[in-house]
């Protein structure tokens, strides 16, 4: 069964520019490691949309990464490569 929207503006549109947020353990260089992993999986990074912020306790770091994906498979692969990192607690 295939589900389609009557409105093409609904949902993800590919190719497109997206942003993923990741929370992980601070002090593990996730600020540089996660963008590197995304680049290796074949997505184009949007350098000006890469940022990070440490938690108030300094225990965690939140990393936001902008990237371009050509299709849903590439988007899903980007999400998966981040989830697979052992220091990543969650992705959004």
UniProtKB/Swiss-Prot annotation:
Xref: Gene3D superfamilies: 3.30.70.260
InterPro entries: UPF0250_YbeD-like (IPR007454), YbeD-like_sf (IPR027471)
Annotated Pfam families: DUF493
Signal peptide annotation: none
Family statement: Belongs to the UPF0250 family.
Protein known as: UPF0250 protein PD_0532
Native species: Xylella fastidiosa (strain Temecula1 / ATCC 700964)
Species lineage: Bacteria, Pseudomonadati, Pseudomonadota, Gammaproteobacteria, Lysobacterales
